[in-house]
Swiss-Prot record:
Homodimer. This is Trp operon repressor homolog. GO terms for cellular component: cytoplasm. The keyword Transcription applies. One of its GO terms (molecular function) is sequence-specific DNA binding. Its main location: cytoplasm. It comes from the Bacteria. It is found in: Cytoplasm. Residues 59-82 bind DNA. Keywords: Cytoplasm, DNA-binding, Repressor, Transcription, Transcription regulation.
Amino acid sequence: MYISRNMEQWNEFLDLMRKAFEQGKEQELLTLLLTADERDAVALRVQIVSQLLDKSLAQREIQQILNTSAATITRGSNMIKIMPPEFMDWVKQQLNHNNKNELGGD
């Protein structure tokens, strides 16, 4: 699986992200590093992954609901297929937990 052209830079980024989250500065760091459009794209990818893992809608329906392209949905679907199943189970648990919290559960 392709992760980055420069693993050293990628690992430095991950270390910086870990420190930001540990110190409660994730919002500021991501605002510094990502444009508003990039932040929106990441948030959209989370919604795509959530919908794909939920398996209650066809990809075309997800595309229409999220107002995005078929290619964007396909990229999300393809990444899900190559990730370890245990990791995807964890992601699904996290997304389900977040959705319950948003709906007033937990």
